[in-house]
Amino acid sequence: MKAVRRFAIVGLLFIGIWSYAQETIPFEDEVQEIVERNDSLWDASRTTIVFTGSSSIRLWEDLQQRFPSQQVLNTGFGGSQSTDLLHHLEKLVLRYKPNKVFIYEGDNDIFEKKPPREILATTLEIVTQLKSAVPALEIVLISAKPSISRWKYRGKYKRLNKKFMKLAQQLPDLSFVDVWYPMLNGRKLRKDIFISDGLHMNTTGYDIWYEVLREYVEAP
């Protein structure tokens, strides 16, 4: 009888943990909203480019307007880390059958004290899954950006960017784009390119990104 009771308790605990996990998938509601918004914009008959990643992508509100000759979908979700993108890869990227995808992750990972090697491993898994699903897909890794509020982590961000760059050198159809140094004035961070929180960019900041990324977006 005691054994039966123990099994019952364990079973209830397992069900409770499982139910909690099902109810707390990070960003599930936000991702669903992103999908609904982009589904209403997406023309499946046209070539598609997807920009995805954390809030630096999400807040790029005029992304499509900057590239009017391309169909560009923005599936960025604020506060995300590379593991979150990996979890939602099907809905945020593969669903739209893109020929190119631009990824910005790693910024929040470093802030949350994840080591660069761990972020790189997750990024490699993202790339592997994307290439497995769409072998001809072109993938562009956008470097971690500098910012006022996270400037003290610059050493870790620079190490992460070097790892991204080396990964891109090793794999076909994978490019690395550096936005770090264009956002500096010499060795100093430009402070006129951020909004008041010191983390996210204003229009001038996105002007820099546009100039750096334009050739990758517009390349056939």
Residue spans for each PLM region:
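Oxyanion-hole/transition-state-stabilizing segment in secreted/luminal serine hydrolases
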Residues: S56-R66, Q71-L73, S82-L120, V140, ...
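A short helix->loop->beta-strand "cap" motif at the edges of active sites that frequently abuts
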Residues: V134-E138
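A generic secondary-structure signal
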Residues: R37-S40, H88-R95, Q129-L130, Y216
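Catalytic His-Asp segment of secreted/periplasmic serine-dependent ester chemistry enzymes
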Residues: I148-P220
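Charged helix-capping and loop-helix junction motifs
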Residues: R117-I126, K156-N161
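N-terminal secretory targeting modules
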Residues: M1-I49, E61, Q65, P220
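Extracellular/periplasmic catalytic domains that process cell-envelope and extracellular macromolecules
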Residues: W42-S45, R66-F67, R95, S132-A133, ...
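Conserved beta-strand scaffold positions in the cores of enzyme catalytic domains, especially
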Residues: F51, V72-N74, F176
